């Protein structure tokens, strides 16, 4: 089978990976060079189905539970870090920690001593926390690049356009936010993030700081680089980060650790997450066209399950019930 995939973000690349593994001949079409226009480029890369369950449907937990294993198999060794997730809150916001715990599972309560054992940099900062030991994280930019390189090594062609779709048996649309206004019910959720660089703080895992209005996550990228995010604004505006969002993210980072106030601000970015009303993704087929969209803030977490669903739909295989919609 000859398949054309439109879109080289995380949804398109994972779908290509699954189809190639099943023997399909795949071409990927992407209008822009590189990944910088894809929401995937600005993602946190947290494979955190239990943390996401706090605000998401159970389907996100079920479909995302196997994501870390999928990425480990697809990427070079050491790309996925299985160090868990730490969720903390300032003393004044302790109620937020209990509210978070009441809405999910897969965690254990830990005290100040164990917090320090996990993250020495947070010594004396928090009295209690939630630790999610089964969660993981990866660097989205390295993951996207490695996935593309692996596909190219297997003969997948990446094209910038000018493709005659009639040449293909099947077309798969993974263009995400580009379909807002064309795909019924699809909306944009703006997400702003930043990168900080410092040698004064060291973290081994994603840390989520709870706040009634400005929750923060900070994800270590290695070498003193930290990704901090992310706002969630009901808008499809992909313009530069606003002064307000920048201030709020930096204030939250300072609350997590004062040394971050002296960190270098090396990058800011904005991505538009495509989402439906229920914030769950959809895979649909009409004749020889499949559409994958609505991954919202769960791109790296849910794309493996969606890719398997796409491959099964494309090739007529029976999908394991755990990944079915």
What do the predicted segments below correspond to?
Residues 6, 167-177, 307:
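Short hydrophobic core segments
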Residues 20-40:
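Glycine-rich FAD pyrophosphate-binding loop
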Residues 263-325:
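C-terminal catalytic lobe of FAD-dependent flavoproteins
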Residues 129-166, 170, 174:
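Helical element adjacent to the flavin cofactor pocket in flavoenzyme catalytic cores
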Residues 44-118:
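Dinucleotide-binding Rossmann-like beta1-alpha1 core, especially the glycine-rich loop
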Residues 2-27:
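N-terminal Rossmann-like FAD-binding beta1-loop-alpha1 element of flavoenzymes
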Residues 17-18, 47, 79-81, 177-287:
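Active-site substrate-recognition segment that forms the wall
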Residues 53, 77-87, 106-148, 231-235, ...:
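Helix-loop-beta segment of a Rossmann-like dinucleotide-binding subdomain
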């Amino acid at each position: 089978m000859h398949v054309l995939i439109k879109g080289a973000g995380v949804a398109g690349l994972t779908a290509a990976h699954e189809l190639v593994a099943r023997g399909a001949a795949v071409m990927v079409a992407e209008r822009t060079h590189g990944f910088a226009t894809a929401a995937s480029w600005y993602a946190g890369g947290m494979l955190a189905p239990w943390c996401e369950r706090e605000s998401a449907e159970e389907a996100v937990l079920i479909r995302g539970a196997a994501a870390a294993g999928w990425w480990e198999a697809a990427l070079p060794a050491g790309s996925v870090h299985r160090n868990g997730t730490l969720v903390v809150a300032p003393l004044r916001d302790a109620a937020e920690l209990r509210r978070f715990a009441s809405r999910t599972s897969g965690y254990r309560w830990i005290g100040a001593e164990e917090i320090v054992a996990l993250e020495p940099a947070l010594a004396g900062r928090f009295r209690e926390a939630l630790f999610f030991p089964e969660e993981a994280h990866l660097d989205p930019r390295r993951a996207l690049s490695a996935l593309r390189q692996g596909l190219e090594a297997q003969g997948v062609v990446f094209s910038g356009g000018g493709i005659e779709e009639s040449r293909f048996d099947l077309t798969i649309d993974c263009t995400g936010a580009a379909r807002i206004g064309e795909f019924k019910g699809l909306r944009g959720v703006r997400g702003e993030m930043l990168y900080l660089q410092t040698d004064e703080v060291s973290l081994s895992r994603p840390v989520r700081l709870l706040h009634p209005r400005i929750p923060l996550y900070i994800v270590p990228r290695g070498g003193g680089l930290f990704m901090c995010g992310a706002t969630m604004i009901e808008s499809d505006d992909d313009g530069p980060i606003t002064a307000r969002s920048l201030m709020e993210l930096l204030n939250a980072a300072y609350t997590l650790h004062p040394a971050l106030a002296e960190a270098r601000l090396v990058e800011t970015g904005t991505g538009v997450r495509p989402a439906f009303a229920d914030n769950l993704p959809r895979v649909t087929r009409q004749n020889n066209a499949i559409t994958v969209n609505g991954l919202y803030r769960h791109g790296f977490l849910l794309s493996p399950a969606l890719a398997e669903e796409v491959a099964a739909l494309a090739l007529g295989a029976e999908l394991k019930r755990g990944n079915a919609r």
